[in-house]
């Protein structure tokens, strides 16, 4: 659990392909639309992939170009249907009634998000050329090996192919998206890495903590949790290893082993105030928030960690807003071509 009331992030859906493989459980996404990309009870798509207008499959490849560089139908379809799935959630009938004004508005929003994210692929490739950034042979080979290993997560080739189909992917597209993801990361690090690092070193704090969660946040009596927190505090003050105390007592399942890096305005106020008030190596008294009781230890900022997690840290960096503005401006400044049937793409026509 991270005690954030906001999360500013770099809005790149270039990582969607990697997210699709997280866990590799073999379970499919929810249906993209009630009539257009419905899933059966077994999780398999029941409609042939493609764009169907008036019942006829039509060619739409490429769907777009950006400064002359193509956005393939497969890429556009993947992004569009993935957004449709996320909007629909577990409601397999969500997209059935496109005459519903709320559904129609959601479809327009999905289409806008899809456009922006689809265009980011050629935008980043062109930006990489400007900066002289590229993937090394070793990086490309590593991605190819990872792609070759993906099938090993599944019991058979058929299961793997089914997983790809349910998630609107092909083998080739999954590999290309991973290549693009790594390239975009290198572009952002080249363009903003120094600024991100400087911001982290100046404005971030690094802490670990032990959380004793409230069993019932609404209860009037938290004496049992307070007693447990007091026990942890006494052990920490006596010099016991803080990592060992985290392993034994911590009830924050989202806390990484190295703890949290964050600036002001990210964590809940009590946690933030206590963290910034500490000196490196110092341990707080018991800090109460709406989540429970915390014992916080401040640690030095680790430059090697910062160097290898620049884009993760960028999400909370003041540089993030400038990054997003620059990416948006590059998209707006580009020359965009749309295929003839672009206006007819919707959750009711794209499968």
Residue ranges of each PLM-predicted region?
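Peptidyl-prolyl cis-trans isomerase
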Residues: 231-271, 299-305
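Second-shell loop/turn segments in exported
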Residues: 61-67, 101-115, 124-134, 169, ...
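Acidic helix-start/capping segments at beta-turn-to-alpha-helix junctions
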Residues: 99-105, 119-121, 125, 134-155, ...
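Stable alpha-helical elements in mature extracytoplasmic
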Residues: 71-80, 106-115, 119-120, 124, ...
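Soluble periplasmic/extracytoplasmic beta-strand elements of cell-envelope proteins
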Residues: 63-73, 79, 127, 206-213, ...
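Short, low-structural-confidence N-terminal segments
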Residues: 1-108, 112, 330-351
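Surface-exposed patches in mature extracellular/periplasmic domains of secreted proteins
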Residues: 131-139, 241-248, 284-287
């Amino acid at each position: 659990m991270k005690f954030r009331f906001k999360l500013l992030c770099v809005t790149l859906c270039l990582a969607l392909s990697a997210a699709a493989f997280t866990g590799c459980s073999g379970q499919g996404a929810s249906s993209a639309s009630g009539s257009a990309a419905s899933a059966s009870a077994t999780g398999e798509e029941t409609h042939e992939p493609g764009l169907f207008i008036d019942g006829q499959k039509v060619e739409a490849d490429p769907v777009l170009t950006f400064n002359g560089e193509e956005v393939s139908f497969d890429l556009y379809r993947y992004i569009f249907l993935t957004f449709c799935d996320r909007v629909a959630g577990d409601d397999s009938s969500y997209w059935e009634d496109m005459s519903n004004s709320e559904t129609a508005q959601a479809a327009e929003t999905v289409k806008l998000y899809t456009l922006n994210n689809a265009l980011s692929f050629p935008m980043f490739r062109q930006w990489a050329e400007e900066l002289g950034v590229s993937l090394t042979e070793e990086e490309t080979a590593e991605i190819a090996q990872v792609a070759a290993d993906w099938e090993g997560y599944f019991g058979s080739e058929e299961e793997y192919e089914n997983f790809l189909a349910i998630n609107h992917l092909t083998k080739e597209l999954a590999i290309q998206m991973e290549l693009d993801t790594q390239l975009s990361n290198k572009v952002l690090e080249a363009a903003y890495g120094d600024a991100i690092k400087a911001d982290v070193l100046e404005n971030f704090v690094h802490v670990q903590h032990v959380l004793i969660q409230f069993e019932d946040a609404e209860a009037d009596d938290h004496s049992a949790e307070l007693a447990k927190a007091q026990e942890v505090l006494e052990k920490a003050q006596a010099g016991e290893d803080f990592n060992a105390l985290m392993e034994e007592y911590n009830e924050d399942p989202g806390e990484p082993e190295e703890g949290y890096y964050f600036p002001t305005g990210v964590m809940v106020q009590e946690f933030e105030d206590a963290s910034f008030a500490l000196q490196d190596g110092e341990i707080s008294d018991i800090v109460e928030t709406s989540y429970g009781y915390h014992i916080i230890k401040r640690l030095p900022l680790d430059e090697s960690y910062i160097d290898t997690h620049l884009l993760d840290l960028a999400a909370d960096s003041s540089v993030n807003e400038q990054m997003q503005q620059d990416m948006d401006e590059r998209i707006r400044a580009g020359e965009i071509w749309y295929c003839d049937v672009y206006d007819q793409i919707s959750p009711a026509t794209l499968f």
